[in-house]
Amino acid sequence: MKKILVINGPNLNILEKRESEYPKVRYKDLVAEIKSYAKTTGIKISVKQSNHEGEIIELIQKANKYDGIIINAAAYSHTSIAILDALKTFKKPIIEVHLTDIQKREEYRRFSYISEIATKTISGKGIDGYKGAIDEFKK
């Protein structure tokens, strides 16, 4: 059975309070849906969230027991070379997910450092983006 680590970045824990582009769902419901979907695929999922860059880096550095990472680094996608550097040390598939379409957001959100290393980027599909990422690991 494949084991995948899902890492969610800053402010996703208050998803229901975010801008109108975001799904109006509580974070705990997002996590429940991700886990429920993964269970139907036979993939074991561990979901973590942090508002702190260093904690996200430590999660990546300790991820060797996983077969892949699904990461929504949120605003850190556009700013964190440190997270990019940590991801470069993970030699297994990495799928970047964004709930909103970052290409249709503010100009400063249209670039993602994570995309440089990601096996695939899924953007603008809402919660279904996580399901699509899980499906990539079934292949």
Q: Where on the chain are the PLM-derived regions?
A:
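Short beta-strand elements in bilobed, periplasmic/extracellular small-molecule ligand-binding domains
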Residues: V31, Y37-K48
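Short catalytic-loop micro-motif centered on adjacent basic/acidic residues
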Residues: K44-Q49, I70-N72, T121
